[in-house]
């Protein structure tokens, strides 16, 4: 393991080369400038971190000593609470307050949905999580036991029909029509700003028209319809030429649902990154996610 001496820093050569050759290019930051300012940050913040760690160790020792001293005694909640307060492990309860935030992404502030946690050292997991915001509802249902019966080694049309029926019922519940059933719709189009659904030549509309967000394609022949409920979107794909769409009454070939809203890319609890090589692997995966060029073999 070799090191590069830079001013008052000793830098692992693997990390040094990674920063200089992979991170900094394209940022307009010169390597010498980066390491100079990084050195300043290290020497400014390291003593603060060291003091905090020492404080934590002192508190932990007091906790350990108390439990050794009181081993075998009946537990006294009030006594223990007062002890925790005396070592500043607990602080006095303050008055209720609210935090006012601004400029926070909707994914954090107002959209309720699943959040994934993935280890950054596993490129395949990280890529899957990054792409998990949108997923096929058809695929999800076909591949799980939500739909009863065997999947088989080849496409099971009977199972596929059950999936489509299930999704239509989902649309009935979430994007209810004024009069009709999604299962009976034979054509979808747009008139003015309204989503129009047709059964036997008769027009129907969403009970809540505000759920219609937009479309792709022509108004008379849209290729996708975007709907929204509780700030979560569903993209209905219309393709009469696809294997599914050409047999579907309304030529719906796919239903894409907004799923995992955000992802925590973990570089701590689920990752064992000890030496520089481990850490560079993690940093390289993170860099690939930020640049959008991370790849993994399946």
Question: What is each model feature region?
Answer:
Residues 1-70, 74, 79-91:
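N-terminal-proximal low-complexity accessory segments that begin disordered
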Residues 2, 82, 88-298:
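Catalytic alpha/beta active-site cores
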């Amino acid at each position: 393991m070799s090191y590069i001496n830079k001013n008052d820093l000793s830098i692992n050569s693997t990390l040094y080369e990674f920063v200089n050759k992979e991170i900094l290019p394209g940022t307009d930051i010169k390597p010498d400038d980066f390491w100079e300012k990084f050195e300043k940050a290290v020497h400014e913040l390291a003593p603060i971190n060291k003091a905090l760690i020492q404080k934590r160790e002192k508190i932990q020792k007091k906790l350990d000593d108390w439990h050794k001293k009181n081993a075998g005694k009946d537990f006294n909640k009030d006594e223990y609470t007062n002890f925790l307060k005396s070592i500043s492990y607990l602080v006095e309860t303050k008055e209720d307050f609210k935090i006012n935030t601004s400029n926070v992404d909707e994914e954090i502030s107002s959209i309720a949905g699943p959040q994934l946690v993935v280890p950054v050292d596993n490129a395949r997991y990280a890529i899957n999580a990054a792409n998990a915001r949108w997923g096929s509802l058809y695929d999800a249902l076909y591949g799980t036991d939500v739909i009863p019966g065997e999947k088989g080694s080849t496409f099971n049309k009977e199972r596929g029909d059950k999936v489509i029926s299930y999704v239509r019922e989902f649309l009935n519940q979430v994007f209810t029509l004024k009069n009709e059933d999604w299962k009976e719709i034979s054509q979808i189009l747009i008139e003015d700003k309204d989503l129009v659904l047709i059964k036997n030549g008769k027009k129907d509309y969403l009970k809540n028209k505000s759920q219609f967000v937009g479309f792709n394609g022509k108004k008379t022949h849209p290729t996708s319809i975007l709907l929204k409920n509780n700030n979560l979107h569903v993209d209905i794909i219309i393709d009469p030429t696809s294997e599914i769409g050409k047999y579907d009454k309304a030529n719906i070939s796919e239903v894409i649902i907004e799923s995992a809203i955000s992802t925590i890319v973990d570089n701590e609890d689920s990752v064992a990154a000890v030496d520089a090589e481990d850490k560079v692997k993690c940093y390289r995966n993170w860099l690939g996610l930020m640049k959008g060029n991370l790849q993994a073999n399946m």
